[in-house]
């Protein structure tokens, strides 16, 4: 876009932002911990059920369970909601996903999940926004609790500043990040496959020499 007019965001760790972007907060552009209407579900309805290990790096495993088997102690969400971990180390490890294609359009998950429902912001844009390192660093600084049960402050999440471009630019940014991140994931997968092959070779090498299949010459 070339040189574009910039303005002070008013937040030291963000600095300048494009002049036409508007300042908001998560609690204003999304519903935080929204309610879900389950009146259309029967006890036998199959809904999505996602323990914490089913959610990672933008993906989730769509397990199913009967609606009647799931208690109110679980976190509820519906199609289009974004869920992400509130507890360490799952928060730092990227347990976040957009919940789409849910069984019966509805799901239950760990009680250690935050849920937001985008309103005046593109879902994929805020999804990427929540994965930036600055958000994670400041969120971790708000954690309270002991040992492995430290949790991010919900007040921090609700009041976290979001700077919003036009809807058209949000779509452009999302498309660009989708393409770039997809390419990066392919590279990671290839690297992981290479590491797996090397590890397999290492194990085979050890086995062959300690069992006498080969000898040192």
List the model feature ranges, each with a label:
Residues 5-39, 159, 171, 194:
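Non-catalytic DNA-recognition/assembly elements of restriction-modification systems
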Residues 6-8, 39-47, 141-143:
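Short coil/turn segments at secondary-structure boundaries
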Residues 27-39, 45-82, 98:
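Sequence-specific dsDNA recognition surfaces
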Residues 1-4, 161-217:
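Amphipathic alpha-helical coiled-coil/heptad-repeat segments
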Residues 73-133, 145-147, 153-154:
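A short beta-sheet element
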Residues 15-23, 113-124, 155-178:
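Proline-centric
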Residues 135-138:
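Periplasmic-binding protein-like
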């Amino acid at each position: 876009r070339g040189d574009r007019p910039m303005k002070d965001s008013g937040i030291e760790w963000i600095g300048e932002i494009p002049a036409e972007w508007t300042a908001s907060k998560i609690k204003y552009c999304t519903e935080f911990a929204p309610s879900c209407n389950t009146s259309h579900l029967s006890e036998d309805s199959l809904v999505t059920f996602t323990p914490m290990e089913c959610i990672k790096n933008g993906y989730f495993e769509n397990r199913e369970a009967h609606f009647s088997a799931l208690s109110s102690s679980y976190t509820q969400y519906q199609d289009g909601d974004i869920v992400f971990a509130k507890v360490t180390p799952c928060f730092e490890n990227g347990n976040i996903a957009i919940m789409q294609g849910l069984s019966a359009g509805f799901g239950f998950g760990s009680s250690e999940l935050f849920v937001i429902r985008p309103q005046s912001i593109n879902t994929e844009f805020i999804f990427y926004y929540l994965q930036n390192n600055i958000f994670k660093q400041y969120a971790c600084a708000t954690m309270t609790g002991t040992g492995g049960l430290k949790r991010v402050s919900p007040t921090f999440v609700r009041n976290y500043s979001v700077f919003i471009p036009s809807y058209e630019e949000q779509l452009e940014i999302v498309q660009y990040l989708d393409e770039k991140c997809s390419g990066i994931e392919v590279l990671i997968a290839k690297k992981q496959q290479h590491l797996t092959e090397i590890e397999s070779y290492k194990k085979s090498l050890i086995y062959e020499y300690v069992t006498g299949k080969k000898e040192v010459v």
